[in-house]
Amino acid sequence: MQQNLDKIAERKLPEADQKALQQVFEQTLGLIGNQEDNERKLADLKQQLTDAPKQTLEAQRELSRLKGAPVIPVTQRYATLSVPQLEQIFSERTTEQGELQKALSDANSLIITAQTRPERAQTEISASQNRIQQINGILKLGKNDGKALTPDTRNQLVAEQASIGALINLRRQELAGNSTLQDLGNARHDLVLEKTTRLDQEIQDLQTLINQKRLAQSQETVTKQSLEAQKAGGSSVLATESATNVKLSDYLLRSTDRLNELTQQNLKTRQQLDSVTQSDQALDEQISVLKGSLLLSKI
């Protein structure tokens, strides 16, 4: 078909006829591409359905293990680490949090798609079957809209038939495996949600520990400067310098308190924003899969 399109100029047709024929060839190529795409999707779907029961069971088992495992407090796990080391772990956990949010979004998408698939797929299959019947009638009659079919337009209709047939096969397989895919989505959702809840708490506890260590360092500095000021009582120069250091240390302590407060507020705000973003994504997904459905028209 691509060769026919490449050599269309060799037919030396009038410009209008050549454009019409070019359109037929391009549409036929597009239909062949759609058929191949749906056949690939069908093969991928069959593999997904083969793997899904095992993946569902693994997710359920991992969730059971996770819920049965004791949570070791952050203060116990990381008590000996320095602030920079804790900040590195905090950064890594924040990255993990983003990955879990993506996984949760994917699981939600799988569930929502499975919930709305029966109506959408059955409607599409019905419309596709009607179109195949129309094409069969056209091919049998040898005419389309009163015009006799040419070999090229006949090939286009045959390509459309094959493309629709591949789509019907895909939708039927989706319907047959729908409950399997929904079970997988539910298992993944429950597992990722548990991981997300635990990770959110760990991030909060890490931030609290970082704040505590920062404050302890500042307090240690203040105490040290106060002791030096007491020792320098006999020297006016040293006393003045020590007094200045005490003031600076006190400022450091208050600044640390403020930094900790702002950091904690920022963490809470970011987690709230992540929650809102997750809700928006879920809503967008629901609207997307419901577009054109009877259910949406009733809402």
Task: Annotate each PLM feature.
Residues M1-I299:
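Flexible, low-complexity extramembrane segments of multi-pass membrane transporters/channels
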